[in-house]
């Protein structure tokens, strides 16, 4: 019984991953990011987050629904398209835009990578990295790495906080793989401590933790504010 449950769980996970990649490929150019598939006994909801939702017409959604049913056995899929809040901080969007940019102009890959890296950082990212691997110049395949800001790939941050994406640029010499990694501004970094100014300190909050420290802090604030007025 347990083995059947595990087998079904793995099959569902594989179905989700393969269908997500298929949707991104089918809707290439619409800058699809996150794809959520919610399976219920009545209907299967497919929620697609896109940076260009207007590109996904009702006709296109209907055709995609038929393909998902035929290829993946997803019965009665209902497709919903939602906009992305900040496309410049989305790894999937940046990876696709860069891949399509390189396809249009293979010689401009360095300039494009630098431009998108600046776009990510200007959007408020803590750190970002773009890696391009393939045969873009010369006979042999090479790897180019572009990095900005503070990007940590290990530990809790590397496991839970990084937004990663992979895309492929289809070129005449072959294909080029594009990896994009972004550490977003709202990421929780354990070893970064923010200090509040005296005006921002709440005595009520400190009292909940330690009344003695709250009393000392109250006296300090009174002295600080008095000195500031003088």
UniProtKB/Swiss-Prot annotation:
It comes from Nanoarchaeum equitans (strain Kin4-M). Binds the lower part of the 30S subunit head. One of its GO terms (biological process) is translation. PANTHER family: 30S/40S RIBOSOMAL PROTEIN S3, SMALL RIBOSOMAL SUBUNIT PROTEIN US3. Belongs to the universal ribosomal protein uS3 family. GO terms for cellular component: cytosolic small ribosomal subunit. InterPro entries: KH_dom-like_a/b, KH_sf_prok-type, Ribosomal_S3_C_sf, Ribosomal_uS3_arc, Ribosomal_uS3_C, Ribosomal_uS3_euk/arc. Residues 43-95 form the KH type-2 domain. Signal peptide: none annotated. This is Small ribosomal subunit protein uS3. The keyword Metal-binding does not apply. NCBIfam families: PRK04191.1, uS3_euk_arch. The keyword Ribosomal protein applies. It comes from the Archaea. Part of the 30S ribosomal subunit. Keywords: Ribonucleoprotein, Ribosomal protein, RNA-binding, rRNA-binding. One of its GO terms (molecular function) is rRNA binding. The gene is rps3.
């Amino acid at each position: 019984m347990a083995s059947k449950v595990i087998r079904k769980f793995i099959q569902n996970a594989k179905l989700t991953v393969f269908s997500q990649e298929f949707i991104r490929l089918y809707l290439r150019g619409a800058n699809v990011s996150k794809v959520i598939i919610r399976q219920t006994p009545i209907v299967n909801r497919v929620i697609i987050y896109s940076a260009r939702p207007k590109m996904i017409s009702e006709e296109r959604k209907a055709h995609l629904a038929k393909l998902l049913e035929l290829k993946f056995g997803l019965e009665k899929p209902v497709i919903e398209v939602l906009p992305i809040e900040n496309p410049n901080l989305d790894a999937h969007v940046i990876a696709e835009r860069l891949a399509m940019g390189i396809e249009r102009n293979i010689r401009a890959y360095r300039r494009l990578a630098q431009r998108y890296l600046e776009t990510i950082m200007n959007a408020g990212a803590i750190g970002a990295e773009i890696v391009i691997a393939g045969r873009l110049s010369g006979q042999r395949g090479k790897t180019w790495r572009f990095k900005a800001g503070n990007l940590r790939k290990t530990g809790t941050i590397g496991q839970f906080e990084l937004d990663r994406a992979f895309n492929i640029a289809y070129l005449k010499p072959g294909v080029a793989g594009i990896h994009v990694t972004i550490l977003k501004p709202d990421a929780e970094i354990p070893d970064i401590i923010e200090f509040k100014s005296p005006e921002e300190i709440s005595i009520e909050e400190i009292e909940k933790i330690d009344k003695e420290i709250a009393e000392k802090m109250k006296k300090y604030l009174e002295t600080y504010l008095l000195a500031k007025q003088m």
